[in-house]
Amino acid sequence: MTKREEKRNLESIPVGSLGVIALEGCKTLGEKVDYYLVKWRTERESEHKDSLAFAGYQRSSYLLDSKVPRFGSGEAKGMIKESVRGDDLFIMVDVCNYSITYTLCGHVNRMSPDDHYQNLKRISSAGCCKARRITVIMPFLYESRQHKRTSRESLDCAIALQELVKMGVDNIITFDAHDARVQNAIPLHGFETVQPAYQFIKGLLRHKKGLTIDSDHMM
């Protein structure tokens, strides 16, 4: 494998050993992220990689073993089956993945965004007292369409963000939030909304042959 020399001046050290937890419904994306991280960190050349501050920097995988088993009553619990003490923990969740199912009283139920969010809270609570920093990566922001109140309505998105930070989450990363001003609910914590317009256009041009972008062919 080709080695790439890191020529930047490294003036900071990692917050902690990197750990990635991909919840059910986000496993495939988590595996792709893990593959990229392993490849990128293996190819990097830096004199600091073997120092104590960089312990655990280069590993064969950064994915941590976790699961959310359910009792016969339908209730669940979050379990992290590896140590996360001092880790820089990233939790990935796709709240809009409706393909995941579970059995309750003999009936098969599909997981709703509420179910995925509850699983996120379970895993967050399992690692909040041990991990040095917790970052949630949520491609679709949970309840982002309910970001403001127009009458006697619940502010679900703001409540969800406040719940997460109260449980120990330090940063939340999402993509194209419906209204980025919802971060006002947690002004003292990290909230990043990435605009994916460039990736959408690049994906269309790459997979849709003959696509012409001009005033005659586009709205």
Predicted regions and their residues:
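PRPP-associated nucleotide enzymes
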Residues: 1-219
